[in-house]
């Protein structure tokens, strides 16, 4: 609810909590078990997110939803060892889509690679299927997750003939 991504985190957290409140009130929980949505304020700080996980994992977690790629990267080995699901909706480690390797990480409905592909497909659609010679720029922050789409965009550049500007 605070930090650099508060503008997106606040409404998400509100709706997430409201959904589980609705399940409790309407359905008596999930399978008869009432749900709780404990929150930890991380300010998008990875260390605080890991501290939150460590302090709450023993409370019978159904799933963790950190809303932070940095926190997600640090939690992947922990949730795998602890057998707790991690939902990283639209962010997180893209390669975690391989469920044979990452058994407790679920990054649906999309990830950074999907997003890059969708953007290029949109450009193809709006340019008659041909973007050869066009310039596509990716503005990103200098972090592991900020760089996640680069390889996909490079591969698609080779396939479709556009110039990638980073």
What are these regions (language model features)?
Residues 26, 56-59, 126:
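Generic structural signal for alpha-helix termini and adjacent loop/cap motifs
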Residues 20, 53-57, 123, 161:
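Generic helix-packing signal
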Residues 47, 61-165:
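Extracytoplasmic ligand/sensor domains, especially the bilobed periplasmic-binding protein
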Residues 1-8, 24, 36, 165:
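Short intrinsically disordered, low-complexity coil segments enriched in acidic
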Residues 33-58, 116-118, 166:
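Structural motif
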Residues 14-37, 129-131, 158-162:
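Signal peptide-proximal N-terminal region
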Residues 1-17, 41-46, 68, 139-148:
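Extracytoplasmic "Venus flytrap"
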């Amino acid at each position: 609810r605070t930090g650099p991504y508060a503008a997106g985190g606040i409404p998400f957290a509100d709706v997430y909590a409201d959904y589980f409140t609705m399940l409790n009130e309407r359905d008596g929980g999930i399978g008869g078990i009432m749900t709780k949505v404990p929150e930890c304020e991380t300010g998008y700080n990875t260390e605080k997110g890991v501290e939150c996980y460590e302090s709450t994992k023993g409370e019978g977690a159904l799933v963790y939803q950190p809303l932070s790629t940095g926190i997600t990267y640090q939690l992947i080995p922990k949730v795998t060892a602890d057998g707790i699901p991690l939902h990283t909706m639209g962010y997180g480690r893209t390669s975690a889509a391989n469920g044979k390797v990452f058994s407790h990480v679920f990054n649906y409905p999309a990830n950074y690679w999907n997003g890059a592909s969708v953007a290029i497909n949109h450009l193809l659609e709006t340019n008659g299927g041909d973007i050869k010679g066009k310039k596509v720029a990716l503005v990103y922050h200098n972090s592991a997750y900020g760089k996640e789409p680069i390889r996909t965009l490079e591969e698609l550049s080779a396939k479709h003939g556009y110039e990638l500007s980073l």
